[in-house]
């Protein structure tokens, strides 16, 4: 799935991302809620206003979960097993939303790290985020 080059690219940019988990995660969610308002339906109990503590906390969880996948690039399925079960069985998140989130996350990284998000790194991150999405939707089948 991910080549050695892809893995190196993902790990390299992740060192810039992980220290901003809450900020980038919240920004990603806010962007997703704005651009794709239907995604708000999964968060009826959240204060979705800009700067919301709930959005910041959940954004941090999302980025940290992606970080867990980065730390286990050769076994993302094992690393994200509980999240896969949660999203498929309990939360019943429409799988398309993972693609929307990934797209918004790439935009956030492009805003904050334009020089680091080279075409090669962008392609590697896209493959990585697709792989994470596949893992999270595996329990839907």
UniProtKB/Swiss-Prot annotation:
SUPFAM superfamilies: Globin-like. Residues 1-141 form the Globin domain. GO terms for cellular component: blood microparticle; haptoglobin-hemoglobin complex; hemoglobin complex. Red blood cells. The keyword Heme applies. Gene3D superfamilies: Globins (1.10.490.10). O2 binds at residue 58. Pfam families: Globin. Involved in oxygen transport from the lung to the various peripheral tissues. This is Hemoglobin subunit alpha-A. It comes from Sphenodon punctatus.
